[in-house]
Curated annotation (Swiss-Prot):
Gene3D superfamilies named in the record: Classic Zinc Finger
Family note: Belongs to the IIV-6 302L family.
Name the record gives this protein: Putative zinc finger protein 302L
UniProt cross-references to PROSITE patterns, sorted A to Z: ZINC_FINGER_C2H2_2
InterPro entries in the record: Znf_C2H2_type
Keyword Zinc among record annotations: yes
Length: 378
């Protein structure tokens, strides 16, 4: 079965060949370019595909820049009715609206980015979890290799959405990183390398973008919403759900080892609201200062120039909020249970009892875990 490079629209017969191709300069340098043929108005991705199309296109009706811009405007006009506004540059340098914005979802559901089903995650991601597989990953691990692996899968500028997907699909890699390094290193990658608009902290209060309003062609107003850091602390846990599932399976397979106990200590740090808040303060930045910014933060608003390219902080909040991570009521309950379960495993007597009582296999349901946890009074 052919595998297609998402950047170049080019097919390969194996995943290894796709990976090798995506490391090449040709793929990396031209992956952000979309060619629009003026003969047939087709949009083509990939350097080789562009050259092939130019040589073989039989289109006879030229398309003008103005027509392309008109199409963009019509498309963006329709988008505005879905509460999405766009801003950017047309082919001749003229301003058009292609600025991507989605309303912040702090307390209500959105699309599922992190695992919707805890059971399915355990079955699919960590079926063969063993201490050996974890130790093998740790042996050649470094902060740099972790960052490079993320950058390879999600070339910069990557988003928090990319990071959350990486956590879901690469739970063993994340677990190895936590064992080899610490939360501070992990947060440094998440907050320093990811291209996003910063959280604003003023007098220990945390603000995120709640609404973006277009004032005119170049000026926009960002309305800020103050949030409780406990919400952010809870939200960050969503990243670690696949890793927690991996940890549960690892305990059931090989319970008596220092490696898994060390991981649980790290997980306890994640649940420490004071520590999370301190890390948030370390890696967040004040409101950026530019000559064209009129700072009126006292009114929880400020104006900036529309040509400044950034990813609104609402993207970050939406993708890791408990609204998106735990859409279903059952999932919310499960998240708390998983943490309680892992906390209980640090106590030797409860850990032994739990491992003895819970036998996880392909047909297990989360209800069985609930029953056993009630017996343990977790």
């Amino acid at each position: 079965m052919d595998i297609v490079c998402e950047f170049c629209d080019k097919s390969f017969d194996s995943k290894s060949k796709v990976n090798a191709h995506q490391r090449t300069k040709k793929c990396q340098q031209f992956r952000t370019i979309t060619f629009v043929c003026r003969k047939c108005s087709s949009a083509i991705l990939g350097y080789d595909n562009i050259l092939f199309h130019v040589e073989n296109c039989n289109g006879t009706t030229p398309i003008l820049h103005k027509e392309i811009e008109d199409k963009i405007k019509v498309k963006n006009h329709n988008k505005e009715h879905d509460n999405k506004i766009f801003f950017g540059k047309g082919l001749n340098g003229k301003t058009v609206y292609i600025f991507n914005y989605e309303k912040s979802m702090l307390t209500y559901g959105s699309t599922n980015i992190i695992s919707e089903s805890i059971v399915s995650t355990i079955d699919n991601l960590v079926e063969k979890a063993t201490l050996k597989s974890l130790n093998d990953a740790i042996q050649s691990f470094s902060k740099e290799s972790f960052l490079q692996e993320i950058l390879f899968k999600y070339p910069q500028p990557f988003s928090i959405s990319d990071i959350s997907k990486f956590f879901e699909y690469e739970s063993r890699t994340v677990m190895a990183f936590l064992m080899a390094k610490d939360l501070n290193d992990l947060f440094e990658i998440l907050f320093k390398e990811c291209k996003l608009f910063p959280v604003c902290i003023v007098n220990d209060d945390i603000y995120v973008i709640d609404k973006v309003v277009r004032q005119n062609l170049d000026k926009w107003i960002l309305e800020w919403k103050q949030i409780d850091y406990k919400e952010v602390s809870l939200s960050l846990k969503g990243f670690f759900l696949p890793v927690l599932n991996y940890a549960i399976k690892l305990f059931l397979n090989e319970s008596n080892n220092n490696t898994t106990l060390k991981l649980l200590e790290l997980i306890k740090e994640i649940a420490d609201e004071t520590k999370i808040r301190k890390l948030m303060s370390t890696f967040t930045k004040p409101i950026p200062v530019f000559e064209d910014i009129q700072n009126i933060f006292q009114n929880v608003k400020y104006i900036y120039n529309g040509s400044y390219k950034h990813t609104p902080m609402d993207t970050f909040i939406k993708n890791i909020s408990y609204g998106s991570c735990f859409v279903k009521e059952k999932s919310i309950k499960t998240e708390h249970e998983l943490y309680s379960l892992l906390m209980s495993l640090t106590k030797e007597s409860e850990k032994t009892a739990l491992i003895k009582k819970i036998k996880m296999n392909d047909n297990d349901d989360i209800v069985e875990i609930e029953k056993e946890m009630k017996l343990l009074k977790v």
